[in-house]
Amino acid sequence: ANPDLLRAAAARGVRAAFIAAAGYGEGDGAGRHLQDELVALCDELGMVAAGPNGQGVVSPPVGMCAQIVGPDPPAGHIAVASQSGNLVSSFLNYATQTEVGISRAVSAGNAAMLGVGDYLEWFSTDAETAVGLAYVEGVEDGRRLAGQLRRATAHKPMVLLKGGVSADGQTAAASHTGSLATDDAVFEGMCRQVGVSRAADVEEAFDIAATFATQPLPRGNRVVVLTTAGGWGVMTADAIASSSLELATLPADLYESIDALLPPRWSRNNPVDLAGGETRDTVPQIMELVAAHPETDAVIFLGLGIQSNQARLMRNGPFFPDHGLDRIVDYHERQDRRFAAAAAEASERTRTPILCATELAVADPSNAGPEAVRSTGRLCYPSSHRAVRALDHLWRYARYREQHGLGSLQG
C-alpha cells in the first residue's frame, strides 16, 4: 500500500512523507529489497521520506503532533531526531514534565533516505531550534556523519546519546533498526573532534539539551555555589572537582559584598553557605552580585523550595488556615517564587548561567520553588550533580567554539 499512497501524495504536490510501517530494512533480505524499492520510488517522484519503521513527526510551533505514541509537548527550542521512536517519546515526556519545550521531533526509523545526521544538520539552521538532541544505535557512514555534525556544531550545540555500546546492545540494535555495530571508542573520539556533547543516559541527554536551550554559554569554567545548607555545597564541590569546571575563589571585593549581607556565621568561602540569611532581598542581591562579577562564569543555586516545603506541612496541618498560618504559608511560597525569578532575571541581565537544583523538582513538583523555575522556562535540576554535568557540557562546547574560532552563538 505504501507505494500507491506515495504516488497519490506526489500527484497532489506532496514532497515529503513519513513511513511508519515496519517490515523493511530492519528485517530479512526481502524487507531490505522492499526498502530499496521504496527509496527508488521516492527518488522517481521527487520526494523525501522519513522512516520506514518509525513512530512519527512532531512540530509544536505549528501545532503538529503526528506520531503513534501520544506525547504532545509544549513548544520550545529542543529539536529531536532518533533511530528509536520510543526514545523520541521519552524526550518528549521529559519536555512535558519539565516544561522545557520542543521545536521539532522525528523518529528516523531505518533511515532509508534521511539519517540522524541529515536532521541535525537541518536543525542547526532552523530558526525555532536552539539545540539538536539525537539518539543513534549505529553508523553506516562515519565520515559523512562526522562532516554533518561538524557543520551543525559550528552553528548550534548538538547532544548525542548512543545505544549499542556493549556487545549485547549491538545485537539488540541490529534487530531493532538494522544498525551496524560501531566501535565505541571511535564514536567517542568523533564526538570530541566535532564538538558534540555525548550523554551517558536518557536523563543526562535531556538535561544537557534543556540547559543549552535555556541558559547562556559560560565565559569560562569558574563556578560559584550558593546554598542554603552546607552538605549540599560539599557534594556540589565534589561534583565540580570531577568535571572540567572549577570552584571559583571568591575575590576580595565580592567576599566583602557578600559578608555585608549575610550573618557572621556564613561559610566565608565558596560554596557560599547562606547560613539562614536567605531573606526576601539578600538572595536576589547576592545572586546579582555573584553573577555580575567578572570572575564568575556560572552559578549553581541549591535549596530552592525549602520554605515552600515547610509551607506545605503547615497547609496540610489541622490548624490551617487559623492562627495566621495562611499568611505564613503565603509568605514562604512567595519567597521561593521570588528567588526563582531572581535567578532567571540575574542570568538574563548578566548573561551568566544560573542553575537551580533541588530534589523537590521530582519529590514535590508542585512545590512553589521548582514550579516557579519552570514558569521562567528553565530546567529545575533534581540534584546538583545533574546540574554540574549539564553545565560541564556547556563549558566544553563554549571552549570548542573558542578554540575553533566560531564566535558567539547567535539568537
Where do the PLM segments sit?
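Catalytic-core regions of core metabolic enzymes
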Residues: 1-411
